[in-house]
Amino acid sequence: MGKNDKKGADKGGKAKGGDKGKDAKDTKDSGSGGKAKGAQSINVRHILCEKHAKKEEALAKLNDGVKFDEVAREYSEDKARQGGSLGWKTKGSLDPKFEEVAFALETSTTNSPKFVEVKTGFGYHIIMVEGRK
């Protein structure tokens, strides 16, 4: 029984490990190939602030549970009237730094946003993604 258990564990381990290794390798080696499976375009919102202090105020509001689109209307220096909505964006259409973090971000809603910060030549961004396709 010990041999059978070991063989079963090895087979299971190889299959699981092989799959994990393959997926990790695909993601690392092919870069955009791994990400392309997830999404070619994203429905993205952002809050753009030129000043670090203003970005920190916006983050505090988000962390206090205020809806993303409401914070965008109050703090964003871009697309404020649309609640920060940039709409559907394809790969290659955004600032490279912005795009890298935006395409890696989980989708969420404005009521309960999952967001990330990034600094680009435009200023400080707080980004959330509403959908991907």
Curated annotation (Swiss-Prot):
User: Taxonomically, which superkingdom?
Assistant: Eukaryota
**Top-level EC class as recorded in UniProt:** isomerase
Per UniProt, the ranges with Basic and acidic residues bias are 1-29
Q: Where is this region: Disordered?
A: 1-42
MF-aspect GO terms: DNA binding; peptidyl-prolyl cis-trans isomerase activity
Q: Which PROSITE patterns would you find in this protein's record?
A: PPIC_PPIASE_2
Q: What is its EC number?
A: 5.2.1.8
Task: Give the GO terms filed under biological process for this record.
Answer: rRNA processing
The UniProt entry's sequence similarity note says: Belongs to the PpiC/parvulin rotamase family. PIN4 subfamily.
Descriptive protein name: Peptidyl-prolyl cis-trans isomerase PIN4
Source organism per entry reads: Gibberella zeae (strain ATCC MYA-4620 / CBS 123657 / FGSC 9075 / NRRL 31084 / PH-1)
Give the encoding gene's name. PIN4
